[in-house]
Structure formats: C-alpha cells, structure tokens
From Swiss-Prot:
GO biological-process terms attached to the record: peptide catabolic process; proteolysis
SUPFAM superfamilies linked: Bacterial exopeptidase dimerisation domain (SSF55031), Zn-dependent exopeptidases (SSF53187)
Job of this protein: Cleaves the N-terminal amino acid of tripeptides.
One GO MF term attached to the UniProt entry: tripeptide aminopeptidase activity
Lineage of the species this protein comes from: Bacteria, Bacillati, Bacillota, Bacilli, Bacillales
PROSITE patterns given in the database record: ARGE_DAPE_CPG2_1, ARGE_DAPE_CPG2_2
EC identifiers of the protein: 3.4.11.4
Catalytically driven reaction(s): Release of the N-terminal residue from a tripeptide
Source organism of this protein record: Listeria monocytogenes serovar 1/2a (strain ATCC BAA-679 / EGD-e)
Broad class of the protein's primary localization: cytoplasm
Protein's name according to its UniProt entry: Peptidase T
Sequence positions that bind Zn(2+) 1: H79, D142, D199
One GO term describing the cellular component: cytosol
Length: 410
C-alpha cells in the first residue's frame, strides 16, 4: 500500500491544478481537467464502475456493493485543485525516508529550511517518511493526498472481496479552494446518503463544524493629479484602502485567532492613486457574529463613500458557505462511525472545528451530510507543506474500515 500511495501521490502533485479566482469558467484552470482525465483512466483500470467526468471536471465513479445486506450508499470526495496562495507549477516532491527529527533543507540555494524550531509538530514525525516541496512551490497534499487515498482504498477493496461493503460512490471536484467546488455538483446523480471529504490535516483529524464564510471585494476610486499641484484635488485610492483596513480590529486577524474565534483576513491590496482594490475573507463559527462582521464591513464602506463621494467605494459582499454542524448533528452517527473506525486502527480521533471550509460544508446544505476526515498533510498552502506517508496509509485504512463498518452494522 505504501508504494502505491507514494507512486500515485508523486504523480498527481506534478500536474499543475491551481485554481483561479478571476476565471469565470469551470474548471477555472485546464490542469484540473487534465488531472480529472488521468483519474478517469486510472479508475477504469482498477475496475471501478460508472466512471464519468462531465464538462466541468467533476469525476464520479462507483464501487458496487459486495454485500447481501441493504447498506446505505456512502461517498468519499477529494478536490482536484490546489490553493492560490503559492504556485503549484513544476512541483518537485522530495521524499525523506526515516526522518531524523532535524532541519530539512528544502532548497539550499534559496535557504529554505523546514525546521522543528518553526514547526514543532515535526518532532512527532521522527522515523517517518516525509514528502516535502523543493522550497519553491506548494506541495498539493491539499488535496491530492485525499485523491490518492481514495484511489488506493478503492483498489484495495476491489482486490480484497473478502472485505464486505455496500455501494460506494467517489467524486473528485474542481475549484474547492476558491469556494466553487459544490456549485455544479449533482447530489442526486451522486446518489449517496452520506459522504466524507478526505480533506483534513494531520492524523486523527475529524471535523463536522466549519466556518460561516463570506468574501468582500472593495474597489476604491480616487483622483490622480500631478503631485506638484495636488493640494485639495488629489484623492489617493491606495490610502483609501489603507484607511478602510485601519477600521478593522487588528486582533481579529488569522494570525491572532484560534479555536472558535472568527476573523477578517486581508488577502490582497493592489492599485494606484486612481484606483485600488482590496480583497477580504470573513470567517466565524457563530452565525450572529458572522452577520455582525459582514455588517461591519458594509458600514465601513458606506462611511468612506460618504466621506469621499458617491461611487468612490464599491463593495461586493458574497456568502461562500455556512457552518455544516447544523446539517450533520441530526445524523451524528456518521461522525461516530468514523471515530469507531479510527479507534479500531489505533488512531485517536481529534474532533475539532475546521478553521476553514471544505466541499462538505456546501454539500451538507445541498442535502448530502459530509464530515471531513484527515488526509495527513501539514502546513497547507505554502512551501513548507508536507505529508507523512504513514499518515496517508492510515487515512486509506480509515476509508476501508468506514466502508466495512457501515456494512457490518446493518
């Protein structure tokens, strides 16, 4: 299993599937369709049934039941795209066997070092096989570790018919990182009663609470005048954007929050004197606080527009997804069965809120309750991203055990 996981994973991460927030098509980048087509071929090769990919890059396939029982159809999902935070082009995965617990030099020329001093959790991976970046890209364990684990789990179940299971549906979705994954996902065609995203972090993570999420895009329109004659005439759009940001509580940012604390996050600010643009994301677990945060953003925009003139500030505020806890708690047994599967494999479940989102957040509101299971990765979305091969083995085993337990309990 280890060898197959390593082979598939290192193949998948080399396909550039970074999504693109600015694109209006689906998938937003051609690399996602390239990977989708690779996976379709491989799914057919291992013997999966009803293998399809639609024009939008959604891959679906079926592993038929080998049980005589009436078992609920369950699904496993992962996403094709990688994050926009750092390039996913020319990913060169580095394999470090029997990690010694010390600094890992990712890139000598650029002096990029993955160090337990900066990332203390590395100490827990001593003796493991770590897969890292070369210090110039992200790795893409989010979520190609999940894709790999689903592929290997399905292959294992096909080759081990003595493991009884009900019908299993799998899906690989585009554009999750920009919040569009479930937009064109056909829940009815998927046909599962419950599903799981393999999109979590370290070993044991199990999540059924997510943020409520919104995005805010603000355009500031200034007035560019020659600096020598600018008095009482120039309006600097960049300074307007800075003034906007100054009115947001500084301690309510990602770098100062944890647990159930929400935040405002300035993703980007660019422009010039004439025009500037800011892009924020807004996150909170509590729905009322979430609404308050959006109201605060809107009120700042209104105040600045009143100050600088009509049309000087344009705000586009969009909800992205909601806390899936509300939809999963009524069927909490689907979380409990994963906890049981983990314990059967000597994994201690670590149930915590997702300080982020998954396709499952939106799918749960579309009628498909979808908790999130660990994929094994750490430090997602950056050059220090890595995954332990042993954690990927365990995640694969969890998929298999969950399928077995669903059949056993009927």
């Amino acid at each position: 299993m280890k060898e197959e996981l390593l082979k598939r994973f290192t193949k998948y991460v080399k396909v550039d599937t970074q999504s693109n927030e600015e694109s209006t098509v689906c998938p937003t980048t051609p690399g996602q369709m390239e990977l989708a087509n690779i996976l379709v071929t491989e799914l057919k090769e291992i013997g999966m049934q009803e293998v399809t990919v639609d024009e939008f890059g959604y891959v679906m396939a079926t592993l038929p039941s080998n049980s005589t029982k009436e078992v609920p159809v369950i699904g496993f999902l992962a996403h094709l795209d990688t994050a926009t935070d750092l390039t996913g082009k020319n990913v060169q995965p580095q394999v470090h066997e029997n990690y010694d617990g010390k600094d890992i030099i990712l890139n000598k020329d650029l002096n990029v070092v993955l160090s337990p001093k900066q990332f203390p959790e590395l100490a827990g991976y001593k003796g493991k096989t770590l897969i890292t970046t070369d210090g110039t890209t992200l790795l893409g364990a989010d979520d190609k570790a999940g894709i790999t684990e689903i592929m290997v789990a399905m292959n294992h179940l096909i080759n081990h018919p003595e493991i009884k299971h009900g019908k299993i549906r799998i899906a690989f979705t585009p554009d999750e990182e920009i919040g569009r994954g479930p937009e064109r996902f056909d829940v009815e065609a998927f046909g599962a009663k419950y599903a799981y995203t393999m999109d979590g972090g370290p070993l044991g993570e199990l999540e059924y609470e997510s943020f409520n999420a919104a995005s805010a895009k603000i355009t500031f329109k200034g007035n560019s005048v020659h600096p020598g004659t600018a008095k009482n005439k120039m309006v600097n759009a960049v300074k307007m954007a800075m003034e906007f940001d100054a009115r947001i509580p500084k301690d309510e940012a990602p770098e100062y929050t944890e647990g159930y604390e929400g935040f405002y996050h300035l993703i980007s600010l660019n422009g010039d004197v004439e025009q500037a643009r800011s892009y924020y994301i807004i996150r909170d677990f509590d729905h009322l606080k979430f609404v308050e945060r959006k109201t605060h953003i809107a009120s700042i925009a209104k105040e600045l527009e009143e100050k600088y003139g009509e049309g000087s500030v344009e705000l586009k505020l969009n909800d992205q997804y909601y806390n899936m806890r509300e939809k999963i708690e009524p069927v909490k047994e689907i979380v409990d069965i994963v906890s049981a599967a983990m314990r059967n494999l000597d994994i201690e479940p670590k149930i915590s809120p997702i300080r982020g989102g998954t396709d499952g957040a939106q799918l749960s509101y579309k009628g498909l309750p979808t908790p999130n299971i660990f994929g094994g990765g750490e430090n997602f979305h950056g050059k220090f991203e890595y995954v332990a091969l042993e954690s990927m083995v365990k995640a694969t085993e969890v998929i298999i055990e969950v399928a077995r337990l669903f059949e056993e309990k009927e």
